[in-house]
Amino acid sequence: MQLKVLVTSDRPDEYVGKKGLVKNQVITCQDVDPSGYRLLMPFDYTLSDDEKAKYAGKLLDKQVVIGVRELVPFGGRLRARGAIISGPDGKNN
């Protein structure tokens, strides 16, 4: 599913996992679908290494389109898995 979202937070995230320290760049997204049928709760999305190089620190208060394959619980919040389809400039990746 494709979601047009507003990025409300763009931050580094660190935690200790099974294989040691894990460092990610995480954005918090609020669905802004123009149809009015929106997700009520904001969700987190972890940037891939390619996306991190391109977008880290540049998405705050911008709208992007994210292709979501699944929403999974992570630390009491929902975290999306997928890819950024179009960036804040409206161009496809």
Each language-model region and where it sits:
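OB-fold/S1-family single-stranded nucleic acid-binding modules
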Residues: 69-93
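Structural detector for short beta-strands of small beta-barrel domains
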Residues: 1-24
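Oligomerization/assembly interface segments of phage tail-like spikes and tubes
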Residues: 27-32, 66-70, 87
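OB-fold and OB-like beta-barrel modules that bind single-stranded nucleic acids
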Residues: 5-9, 60-71
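Acidic surface patches and DE-rich sequence motifs
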Residues: 13-18, 33, 73, 87
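A generic structural signal for short beta-strands and their flanking turns/coil linkers
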Residues: 1-3, 23-25, 41-43, 60-64
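Short nucleic-acid-contacting surface segments enriched for D/E, G, S/T with interspersed K/R
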Residues: 47-66
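OB-fold (S1/OB) nucleic-acid-binding surfaces
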Residues: 16-46
